[in-house]
Swiss-Prot record:
It comes from Yersinia pestis. The lineage of its organism: Bacteria, Pseudomonadati, Pseudomonadota, Gammaproteobacteria, Enterobacterales. Pfam families: CesT (PF05932). It comes from the Bacteria. Keywords: Activator, Plasmid, Transcription, Transcription regulation, Virulence. This is YopE regulator. Gene3D superfamilies: 3.30.1460.10. GO terms for biological process: protein secretion by the type III secretion system. Positive regulator of YopE.
Length: 130
């Protein structure tokens, strides 16, 4: 089982980034235009999140259609923070199930999800079935 510090060290090595002398409870990594934040929350889980800037977050129903169920536990989930009502895209996985590539894959899926949200034009919400 990895500790949070070991997981961050491994991820920074994979990204060819210099490993911080002190690993803070929340670590930030810039991937392209996205600031991705990594923390252990709840205990035993690696949580990654980013704050995508969405052109029109008034259409929450349409944006939430991206939250379709998936077999992939790393698929990002779109939410809104309680305080400011800003969009938050996040995913997490258990520390005890990490392997050599799972953190990198988790970060990659988070960034791909943020890119999809920002570059795709808003699609119509799913049709209701009668």
């Amino acid at each position: 089982m990895y500790s949070f510090e070991q997981a961050i060290t491994q991820l920074f090595q994979q990204l060819s980034l210099s490993i911080p002398d002190t690993i803070e409870p929340v670590i930030g990594v810039k991937v392209g235009e996205f600031a991705c934040h990594i923390t252990e929350h709840p205990v035993g889980q690696i949580l990654m999140f980013t704050l995508p800037s969405l052109d029109n977050n008034d259409e929450k129903e349409t944006l939430l259609s991206h939250n379709i169920f998936s077999q992939d536990i790393l698929k990002p989930i779109l939410s809104w923070d309680e305080v400011g009502g800003h969009p938050v895209l996040w995913n997490r996985q258990p520390l005890n199930s990490l392997d050599n590539n799972s953190l990198y894959t988790q970060l990659e899926m988070l960034v791909q999800g943020a890119e999809r949200l920002q570059t795709s034009s808003l699609i119509s919400p799913p049709r209701s079935f009668s």
